Amino acid sequence: MSFQTIFDIQQSMAVNNRRMVGQQVARSGYITVAQYLTAVPWVFTIQPHAYLYYPQVRDIIQTIDNKDRQLPEQISFASTNLQWFVKMRGTATAATLNGAPAANTQTLALNSNGTFKAGDFIMVSGYVYKITADSAGSSVSIHRPLIGTPASGTTVFLGTACTFNVVAESCPTYTLNPMTDGAFVQWDSAFVFREYIT
C-alpha cells in the first residue's frame, strides 16, 4: 500500500505515455519521422506531499524502503481524490473481447453495452490502454500495441476498474526536519514509477 499512498496524497503528477518516435532533418530541410514498435510503458512522475508527520507515516516509508526499486505494486485511481484521471466519459459499463485479437494490434473488437470516448481508459489482461477516438462500442482504437495474447471473451475493465502495475524507477531519499515530538518528512526529489511489463 506504500506507493498507492504516495499517489493518493501527491502534490502533482506528470504522465508519460508517448510512443518512441525518431526524427531526422536533412540538410535540404525535409524531415523524416519513424515510430518504433515498443510496449509504450506508462511512466508517472509523482511529486510527493511535503511535510508529512514522520511518526504517522514511518510505516509507509518502511514499506517504500522494503519495495525500493525492485518490487512492483498495483496502483488504482479509483479513490475520490484520483478518479477524475480514469473516469469513463463514454456510456459503456461492461465489455469483453469479441474474438482473439492479432498480435500487436491497435484495434480491438468488443462486445460492450455502450460507447467509448477518446481518452477513456480500458484494461485488457492486466495492461491499461487509452481509447484514441470516439467509438460506438463494437470496435475501439488504442494508443499502443496490444501486449500479450488475450483470448476471445476476455473481460475488458473500464475506467476506475483499471489498475497500473508499476515499479519505482526512482525512489527519493528524505530529510527529517525536527519539530515538537517528531519531525516533518521532506523528500529530496520526485518518485518516478514505470509500468512493469512482464
Language-model features, listed with the residues they occupy:
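Short solvent-exposed strand/turn elements
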Residues: 137-163, 187-198
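Oligomerization/assembly interface segments of phage tail-like spikes and tubes
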Residues: 33-54, 178-198
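Short, solvent-exposed beta-alpha or beta-beta edge segments that form flexible loop/patches at the rim
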Residues: 23-35
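C-terminal edge-of-domain segments
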Residues: 3-7, 32, 191
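Autoprocessing Asn-cyclization modules and mimics
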Residues: 57, 62-143
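Ser/Thr/Pro- and often Gln-rich low-complexity regulatory segments
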Residues: 54, 159-169
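Polar/acidic, low-complexity leader/linker segments enriched in S/T/G and N/D
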Residues: 1-20
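Low-complexity, intrinsically disordered Gly/Pro/Thr-rich segments
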Residues: 167-181
